[in-house]
């Protein structure tokens, strides 16, 4: 028997990837596409490549007969929309940032709004499947992680958990394809602006910083602060992070490889690459995999960690489906058994 799901925000890039994955999921039926601006429009008119003959509607959510609702909506939207009564009717996976951070003050500082739903904020489960699998299985509200945060946390988590690095020395240099900026028309995202150009943005102010720090602090069991700098690169999709940290002791590469293997050997979507094989975005494109590898610089006593994901899949829609699979006791990789087409 298939579960019935709905999507708010299916017109965006992450929303469209969600539709694409769910259409091929054997245990899911897409029953509702919600929109306030495209009511009556057929989804195929918006995305002719997508075989979904379903029109957008604008119903009161309390009227919907769904098992699960995905929210691929702008920040602040779901924080105002969700309530306990709705969560008694259906499960929710929120792809926005509205329920990712536990401290309400972080929303005022980083997102510039006062969170209106602080009780639900505390009850939401952070949907990074490889770290919080058991909590996700029991959750009614899952906050799907951000794209940069997914790649950064997964790449560094074992090092923080084992406390083998100087936490105050961590620097993350991240690069993302343009789809990470969303589908809305913006001058800075036009072809002539991004083609043959790489630029940094959000210096010391990117909104994913507190999310990364929060969950690596949980791993370290102490408050940590790190440096995170993102860059926009002229490709459609993909994230590559290069992270640097000082080692606390004289460790060899095999020592660190043993640590990563300890944490990730049983995970279906994390691939610890062989020695000397460095992650590339094309190897994870359109897949739910996270590729990770590292090198130890014996001269500087630093570990250099590389991680790669597809920002729209493992960084958004694929991870949302992975969360759904856990919440409904499906195989974790159901509907996600695809890999990069080189």
UniProtKB/Swiss-Prot annotation:
Keywords: Amino-acid biosynthesis, Arginine biosynthesis, Cytoplasm, NADP, Oxidoreductase. InterPro entries: AGPR_AS, AGPR_type-1, NAD(P)-bd_dom_sf, NAGSA_dehydrogenase, Semialdehyde_DH_NAD-bd. Pathway: Amino-acid biosynthesis; L-arginine biosynthesis; N(2)-acetyl-L-ornithine from L-glutamate: step 3/4. It holds the Pfam family Semialdhyde_dhC_1. GO terms for molecular function: N-acetyl-gamma-glutamyl-phosphate reductase activity; NAD binding; NADP+ binding. HAMAP family: ArgC_type1. Belongs to the NAGSA dehydrogenase family. Type 1 subfamily. This is N-acetyl-gamma-glutamyl-phosphate reductase. It comes from Campylobacter jejuni subsp. jejuni serotype O:6 (strain 81116 / NCTC 11828).
């Amino acid at each position: 028997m298939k579960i019935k799901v709905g999507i708010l925000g299916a017109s965006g890039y992450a929303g469209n990837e969600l539709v694409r994955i769910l259409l091929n999921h054997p245990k899911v039926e897409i029953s509702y596409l919600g929109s306030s601006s495209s009511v009556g429009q057929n989804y195929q008119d918006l995305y002719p490549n997508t075989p979904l003959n379903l029109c957008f509607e604008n119903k009161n959510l309390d009227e919907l007969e769904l098992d699960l609702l995905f929210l691929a909506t702008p920040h602040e939207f779901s924080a105002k929309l969700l309530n306990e009564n709705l969560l008694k009717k259906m499960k929710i996976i929120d792809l926005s940032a509205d329920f990712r951070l536990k401290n309400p003050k972080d929303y005022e500082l980083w997102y510039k709004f006062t969170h209106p739903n602080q009780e639900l904020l505390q009850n939401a489960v952070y949907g990074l499947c490889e770290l919080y699998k058991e909590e996700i299985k029991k959750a009614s509200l899952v906050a799907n992680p951000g794209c940069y945060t997914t790649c950064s946390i997964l790449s560094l988590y074992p090092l923080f958990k084992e406390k083998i690095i100087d936490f105050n020395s961590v620097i993350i240099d991240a690069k993302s394809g343009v789809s990470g900026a969303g589908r809305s028309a913006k001058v800075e995202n036009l072809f002539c602006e991004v083609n043959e150009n790489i630029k940094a943005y959000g210096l010391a102010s990117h909104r994913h910083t507190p999310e990364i720090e929060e969950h690596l602090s949980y791993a370290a069991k102490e408050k940590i602060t790190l440096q995170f700098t993102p860059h926009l690169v002229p490709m459609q999709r993909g994230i590559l992070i290069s992270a640097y940290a000082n080692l606390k002791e004289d460790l060899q590469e095999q020592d660190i490889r043993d640590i990563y293997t300890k944490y990730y050997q049983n995970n279906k979507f994390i691939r610890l690459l062989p020695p000397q094989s460095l992650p590339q975005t094309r190897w994870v494109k359109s897949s739910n995999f996270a590729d990770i590898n590292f090198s130890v610089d014996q001269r500087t006593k630093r570990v250099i960690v590389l991680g790669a994901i597809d920002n729209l899949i493992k960084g958004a829609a694929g991870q949302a489906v992975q969360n759904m699979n856990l919440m409904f006791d499906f195989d974790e990789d159901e509907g996600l058994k695809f890999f990069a087409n080189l």
